[in-house]
Amino acid sequence: MNIREAIAAVVARRDLTQAEAASVMEEIMSGTATPAQIGAFLTALHMKGETDAEIAGMAAVMREKATHVYFDGPVIDTCGTGGDGAHTFNISTTAAFVAAGAGLTVAKHGNRAMSSVCGSADVLEGLGVQIELDAEGVARCLREAGIGFMFAPKFHPAMRFAGPVRREIGIRTVFNILGPLTNPARARYQVLGVASAALAEKLAYALSRLDTVHALVVHGDGGVDELTLSGPNLIFDVRAGQAPRQMLVAPEDVGLPRAPQDALRGGDVAYNVAIVRAILSGEEHGPRRDVVLFNAAAAMVAGDLAPDLATGVAMARHSIDSGRALERLNQMIAVSRGE
């Protein structure tokens, strides 16, 4: 199916198969499709609503077109789709260091802030990490620090064809949700935070169509794209060859007290950097530390390091209290800067 045929189909509200969506994405990412065709397709797809098959087909092509990071061993990604408007501090980024301190190899894929003041790239840069590394630089971080960061614009050169169109049409499109599915290090383990419950289910099924080994897709209480402390969280457990399993998990189920969402608010880069350092150094106790423990625990489970979230919380606590989480941050800073 070519993109003109796909536009006609989607305008008529017909869902594309995974193979058809992949074929269209191939045209977009090879520069064959015109800007007008890309804009029409993205808008029509958004209005129809993307299916898990369409998302998976497009993600598979975007993965292939990425600049790959090669690492000999399993890696996990912790990220969110963003767009929740909650303005929390950088929870998943902090949790990534805690997960690395517990023994996982974390290949984090992210960008600068889109809907918040301070995105993962912004806070890492503020902490002293050199974020614009090439594939070999990231691989070195994975080998020597147990955690690396792939700055999305550097690793998706084929996005240059769709990027200007996305900016010009100014609406959220399927590309806003493809980023977390297209890790250049081919992470087959993942924690994916999603701000919408309906989209969380859709992305769980999309991941089950890809080569995922184990992932947790999480939707926080109140519409947040990470596990939170204010109430029950929706989790989809995705394992290779199985339909996603849905569950509700409240903080007290894993031994953590509830806290209002306002207790997790972040600020500008300097403010968030101070929070991350205070948590990783063990100085901070309270809701901000607790929410990091919760989200790091999800990584332990998705990475098959912990059998359940309660055990994961205990492992996360030890990662911080032993100094290993902070050590991972300091190692990442040094390795990324060539020191």
UniProtKB/Swiss-Prot annotation:
**PANTHER family in the cross-refs:** ANTHRANILATE PHOSPHORIBOSYLTRANSFERASE
What is the name of the protein in this document? Answer: Anthranilate phosphoribosyltransferase
List residues binding Mg(2+) 1: 92, 226
Question: NCBIfam families in the record, alphabetically?
Answer: trpD
Name the family the entry cites. Belongs to the anthranilate phosphoribosyltransferase family.
Tell me the cofactor note: Binds 2 magnesium ions per monomer.
UniProt subunit comment:
Homodimer.
Q: What class of enzyme is it?
A: transferase
* UniProt-annotated binding residues for anthranilate 1: 80, 111
Organism's domain of life?
Bacteria
Which of UniProt's keywords are assigned here? Amino-acid biosynthesis, Aromatic amino acid biosynthesis, Glycosyltransferase, Magnesium, Metal-binding, Transferase, Tryptophan biosynthesis
Give the pathway.
Amino-acid biosynthesis; L-tryptophan biosynthesis; L-tryptophan from chorismate: step 2/5
Q: Which GO terms describe its cellular component?
A: cytosol
Q: Which reaction does it catalyse?
A: N-(5-phospho-beta-D-ribosyl)anthranilate + diphosphate = 5-phospho-alpha-D-ribose 1-diphosphate + anthranilate
